[in-house]
Amino acid sequence: MLYYVNKFLSNSKVQAVILGIIGLATISMLVSYKLDDPSFNSATTGYTNNLLGIFGSYLSDFLYQFFGVAAFIIPLSCFIWGKNCWQQKYRKSFIRISVMLLALFSTAALLSNFDLEFVPSNGGGAAGIIIFHFLKQFTNQLHLLLVFFTFIIFVVLFEIKFTSLSSFIIKLGKFLAYKIQTFFYNLFSQLTLPKLFSGKANNKIKITPSYTKPVNEKIRFTEEPKPIMAKPAPVNPIKFFNKPTVPKISQNDATALPPISLLRNPENHHIKGASSSELKQKAEELLTVLNDFGVKGQIINIGQGPVVTLYEFEPAAGTKTSRVVGLSDDIARSLSALSTRIAVVPGKNVLGIELPNKQREFFCLKELIETPEYQDTSTLLPLVLGKDLAGKPLIADLAKMPHLLVAGTTGSGKSVGINAMIVSLLYRYTPEECRFIMIDPKMLELSAYDGIPHLLTPVVTEPAKAVVALKWAVKEMENRYRMMSNIGVKNIAGYNTKIQEAVKEGRIIEKSIQTGFDPETGRPIYETVAMNMEKLPFIAVIVDEMADLMLVAGKDIEMLIQRLAQMARAAGIHIIMATQRPSVDVITGVIKANFPSRISFKVTSKIDSRTILGEQGSEQLLGMGDMLFMGNTSKITRVHGPFVNESEIEQITEYLKETGTPEYISAVTEQSDEDDSSIDIGDGTSDEVLYKKAVQIVRDERKSSISYIQRSLRIGYNKAANLVEKMEKEGIVSPPNHTGKREILLPER
């Protein structure tokens, strides 16, 4: 019984009605008060004129005696509180009581100097007289009247337009702060100070943008990659310089980090969320829907985020999780919601039911780049993913992933998410520290970055060149491994640290290479050669549409991606691979096994969601940047991505093009004669090479079956059948006999 009473009284409409009744009753007994009615000061037994009878007569006399005419503040406050409850505008209880008491005692003290005939005491009652005479000994009467009048004006502003007034003051303060910050930034960024104490390397004054990184920071890799939700840390990012296989950028053309002013400011930062009563009401509706489908339980916690609200539902004993998860579409229909996602909350005995908010918060990339989480130096390659369900910034470290697989349909926000990741790297590293290989078969998404100095080659749009670029990345990885092996380190962090220490000490690191053999003893002859004393940069390989490449050169692309994904982490080469068709022929088992970190934007079906994440749920996302992020701990987190528009990308790329000139490496997309040319990329040259290799296999192995050639060349059945038919036409093999076997007409070697 008590539960239902509390539930009834917790309703905002009921609270508003109760406050209205109390206010109406109080003002009725105050208005109908008569001096000759029975009261504490009058012992008459006559008829009472008060509308509330003998109770109203005594209570109104007490209020007049103690507060005077200021007693009308009490019913007025009840009316205002009731109106706020009806409109679901809440303030904390102690704030309500404090404001009412301030208004009550200020009005009583202000009216204590006036004598009124219709009240038993003066205009302010006993409380007004005590307060006024107590404060009068510290100042004169006029000052007191002004102070009490000011308090009353403050209370009126607080109750009527406090929210609008405070919002205006906050916006004005932010606007002025932004203008002052921009003025000083532009002023100091244009100053050029001469070098002081020339000849001393450690005595320099250097003015750098606020996001430039100091050198000499030790790099560390950990084994448990996970999204970073770090505490604020000082901005002290790591900095690398040049590399042996990538051409240096001259000091005159050194590119500065783009200023934060190129990104637009957030617009709708203050979106009103649902009130506590609305959340409770929605929770009750959710429980009703679950009960209708035979699922019992209770909601133990409600967490409201910028896009969705998480209801933690604890099912009754014996309830299967799959039964509740299967009701997601029915719950969305019953609650008139766009979609509903249900998943187990890690570490808790509850199911998380995520319902979209009425008003969705959209946020910009700028506010996330300005967060301490992005500036944390322990995040080596920060990727701005967005905000989690609680609205906290989520910054992932690509160096710890170490590769990322992204999937999502058209309009899901996949391309915007890729742009946000690229921009987050551009705001952390210069071309001397991080280089890109961008592969865009669609020729649309990554074309905006063509010409920036971070690129090792122009944006690759041809599948044939994409294969060559990936082969170059494999060669670069192997070359880096040899360099790291020569100085006895295991990763790029140790290599850069040793190079940096040697440069500080003025040493030259040498390596031994074999130049031949001793003609007398036959032993190998070694010579000592000085190594290149330049640091190695990170290399990020961005593939925007994997499906197009898999259709043209599937087997070769898969082998190259597999090799890079398995070994390139220690060499500082990382892959971000995206596709809008997450089917099993694009995201194969080999690729999934080597990409433990994955992001799924909205997809069309549960099958696609299981393909990319291993479980359903991506089909229930809201689109426009709503995503599920799975780190290599297999924990799935819902994230809402930031928005970065094309004009911001254009401004950033134009700034980078003006401050630095790219120096491309032609070998990235040009296949050399030493490369293995047996890659099936769909052009005439590749078919001819395959045919020659097939003929060689038939001559050497004396086997001409289609399946044997298919296995030997690692090609499809149709391609192998075409090669055998061509050999039959050219007289290399005979037509099949009655058993299907062919005779090899070429002579043995």
Curated annotation (Swiss-Prot):
Tagged with keyword Cell cycle: yes
Signal peptide: none
Binding site for ATP: 411-416
SMART domains according to UniProt: Ftsk_gamma (SM00843)
Gene Ontology terms, MF aspect: ATP binding; DNA binding
Membrane protein topology class: Multi-pass membrane protein
GO CC terms, sorted: plasma membrane
Keywords for this protein: ATP-binding, Cell cycle, Cell division, Cell inner membrane, Cell membrane, Chromosome partition, DNA-binding, Membrane, Nucleotide-binding, Transmembrane, Transmembrane helix
Cytoplasmic compartment spans: 163-749
FtsK domain boundaries: 391-610
Function: Essential cell division protein that coordinates cell division and chromosome segregation. The N-terminus is involved in assembly of the cell-division machinery. The C-terminus functions as a DNA motor that moves dsDNA in an ATP-dependent manner towards the dif recombination site, which is located within the replication terminus region. Translocation stops specifically at Xer-dif sites, where FtsK interacts with the Xer recombinase, allowing activation of chromosome unlinking by recombination. FtsK orienting polar sequences (KOPS) guide the direction of DNA translocation.
Protein name: DNA translocase FtsK
Species per Swiss-Prot/TrEMBL record: Rickettsia bellii (strain RML369-C)
Phylogenetic placement of the source organism: Bacteria, Pseudomonadati, Pseudomonadota, Alphaproteobacteria, Rickettsiales
Gene: ftsK
